[in-house]
């Protein structure tokens, strides 16, 4: 085996402990593999085993990164993948309010046992790639006791013709210390849009931007690609057309700017997987404004069509958590008075009824199309036995990595949670069948 010496960091990749005295350390790590940089991403996410990533950085840098995790700023790290060097990369923690901010009781305390991380391969080396990707997400899955949710649900969206990121698993080590099992999730960025929209790849990508305002600043803060000199004229027109129309005219406006059939398929999956922390959940802030999250919108530059992409699906496929969330009217219902706000999480948060939103108000004008999408889902990707087989197969793949994760869960607890998930799938199917039969709410 050849060795990689990283004098700039004072450390390298692998399992060996760092030397004393701060001298450069030679670690067992193969030279970079060009095939890894230029490989097909499909091969990465379809691997039949759990790959290992090693990150090496100075002890004081690692300590500072943990203490300042909420800053979400990259630091230099030397990365190895399956024992081969990936070179110098940017490494940071990542997350939203529920997965990062709430993990800090005080500025320098880190009570959560494991945090999600992100790698940027070209942060310090221009043009550096990993399976043609600039960035890669490692999600801690601390809200998913089975460690299966993201892989199963992203696949389910794609099975229904909805564009969604790819997901698998990986184990991480930092300075030789095991960090445990993570969901390895594709970044939604320019590489993603080139892959998914090859006929229209260079459009604007927005994170958590919804057609609710004509203020350009709102979209400025949420654009992810082609930011420089960006005009948001189409998004603003989209929002304006929805706001100025009612009833069937609002549905016609929605049809102008989106693929309504695709949105109906999106909602069929979203409802089936019990996604109570996605696009239908409009959290109300102290000022009375309400916003949803965990999605992207991609504006196709030629057609002007807006395509919805799901994101952050750990809070799905959980019957118990869904029941705990709270009683909120479904997106198919328009309350008698809007806005209508409801307490969730036992009064800890308030959300606005999604039926008060202009996009959902428009989409609910064609519930027959939505029901057809649900029927397609129930007879196809969500049919009895299919997801149960996926649960068994994926659980078999990650079983050993779960058992070795220093942050848990205990193997017997994990096996129990996997069994609960398999049992809950029939409850989810029954709920969707009941909704097709005319039930407006979850009783």
Explain the meaning of each model-derived region.
Residues 1-8:
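Bacterial N-terminal signal peptides
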Residues 10-12:
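C-terminal motif of bacterial Sec signal peptides marking the signal peptidase cleavage site
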Residues 14-16, 21-443:
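Phosphate/dinucleotide-binding and metal-coordinating scaffold of catalytic cores
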């Amino acid at each position: 085996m050849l060795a990689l010496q990283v004098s700039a960091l004072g450390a390298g990749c692998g399992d060996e402990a760092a030397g004393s005295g701060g001298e450069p350390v030679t670690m067992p790590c193969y030279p970079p593999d060009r095939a890894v940089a230029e490989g097909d991403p499909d091969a990465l996410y379809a691997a039949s085993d759990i790959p290992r990533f090693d990150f090496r950085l100075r002890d004081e840098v690692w300590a500072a990164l943990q203490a300042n995790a909420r800053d979400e700023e990259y630091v230099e790290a030397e990365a190895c993948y399956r024992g081969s060097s990936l070179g110098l990369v940017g490494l940071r923690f990542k997350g939203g309010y529920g997965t990062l901010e709430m993990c800090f009781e005080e500025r320098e305390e880190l009570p959560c046992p494991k945090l999600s991380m992100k790698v940027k391969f070209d942060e310090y080396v221009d043009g550096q790639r990993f399976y043609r990707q600039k960035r890669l997400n490692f999600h801690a899955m601390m809200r998913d006791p089975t460690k299966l949710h993201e892989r199963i649900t992203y696949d389910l969206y794609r099975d229904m013709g909805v564009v969604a990121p790819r997901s698998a698993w990986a184990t991480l080590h930092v300075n030789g210390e095991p960090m445990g099992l993570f969901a390895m999730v594709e970044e939604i960025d320019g590489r993603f849009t080139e892959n998914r929209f090859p006929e229209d790849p260079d459009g604007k990508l927005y994170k958590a931007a919804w057609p609710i305002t004509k203020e350009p600043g709102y979209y400025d803060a949420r654009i992810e690609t082609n930011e420089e000199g960006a005009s948001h004229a189409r998004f603003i027109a989209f929002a304006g057309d929805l706001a100025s129309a009612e009833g069937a005219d609002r549905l016609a406006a929605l049809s102008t700017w989106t693929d309504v059939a695709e949105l109906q398929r999106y909602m069929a999956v979203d409802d089936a997987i019990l996604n109570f922390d996605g696009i239908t959940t409009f959290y109300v802030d102290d000022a009375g404004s309400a916003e949803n999250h965990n999605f992207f919108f991609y504006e196709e530059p030629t057609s002007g069509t807006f395509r919805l992409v799901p994101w952050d699906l750990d809070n799905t496929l959980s019957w118990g958590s869904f029941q705990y969330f709270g009683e909120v009217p479904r997106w198919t219902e328009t309350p008698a008075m809007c806005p209508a706000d409801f307490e969730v999480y036992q009064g800890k948060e308030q959300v606005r009824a999604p039926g008060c939103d202009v996009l959902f108000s428009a989409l609910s004008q064609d519930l027959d199309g939505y029901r057809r999408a649900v029927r397609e889902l129930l007879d196809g990707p969500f049919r009895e036995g299919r997801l149960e087989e996926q649960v068994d197969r994926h659980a078999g793949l990650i079983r050993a990595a779960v058992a070795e994760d220093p942050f848990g869960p205990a193997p017997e607890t994990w096996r129990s949670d996997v069994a609960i998930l398999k049992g809950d799938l029939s409850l989810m199917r029954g709920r969707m069948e009941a909704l097709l039969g005319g039930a407006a709410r979850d009783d």
